[in-house]
A protein has these predicted regions:
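Internal intein/HINT superfamily modules and their associated LAGLIDADG
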Residues: 1-152
Length: 152
C-alpha cells in the first residue's frame, strides 16, 4: 500500500499524537478535554475533515474516514523507514508522540504507551533510552528537546 496523502510536518505531528492514544473506533484519541481539544485542532488544521464530522464520545474525540485511517496505520507501521533521519518530519512525529503521552520526571523524559519499534526509532535518532514495560525513558532530555525545537 502507498500513502496517498502528502506527509507534511503538521500531518506527521498529528500521526505521532494519534498513535499514542488511538481509539479502536475511527481515527481518534482517548484522553482528557485538553488532549481532545489539541487533537481536534490538529485535525482541523490539517484539513482532514470538517468540524461537523468530529465526534465526542465520553473521553474520546474521533472521526470516521477509512482511507485516512489506512494511511495513518501505514505510516505508523513503517515509522522506522519513514522517519529514519533527523529532519523536520521526524521531529514533528516524535514531538507528537511526546505531546500526547510524554512527561518529564527527575531529569528523565518519559513517554508512555510505547512499543519496541518506538524505542528503536528514538535510538536510531541518537538518543539513549531505557524501557520498562510500556514506558520509555529518554536520557539526556536536553538533546531530545533541542532536536525537536531545532527542526520544528
Amino acid at each position: 500500500m502507498v500513502v496517498d496523502m502528502k506527509l507534511t510536518k503538521e500531518l506527521a505531528y498529528l500521526i505521532g499524537f494519534w498513535k499514542m492514544r488511538s481509539t479502536k473506533d475511527g481515527i481518534g484519541i482517548t484522553g482528557d478535554a485538553e488532549q481532545q481539544q489539541k487533537f481536534i485542532s490538529e485535525v482541523l488544521k490539517a484539513k482532514l475533515v470538517t468540524p461537523d464530522r468530529v465526534l465526542l464520545k465520553g473521553d474520546s474525540a474521533l472521526f470516521h474516514h477509512i482511507k485516512y485511517r489506512n494511511d495513518l496505520l501505514y505510516v505508523v507501521k513503517n515509522q522506522n523507514d519513514l522517519f529514519a533521519r533527523k529532519n523536520k518530519l521526524t521531529a514533528a512525529y516524535v514531538k507528537g508522540m511526546y505531546d500526547s503521552a510524554g512527561s518529564f520526571e527527575k531529569g528523565i523524559l518519559l513517554i508512555n504507551n510505547t512499543t519496541f519499534q518506538d524505542q528503536m526509532l528514538i535510538e536510531r535518532l541518537g538518543f539513549y533510552t531505557e524501557r520498562r514495560k510500556k514506558v520509555l525513558g529518554i536520557k539526556h532530555p536536553d538533546k531530545f528537546f533541542e532536536f525537536i525545537e531545532r527542526y520544528s
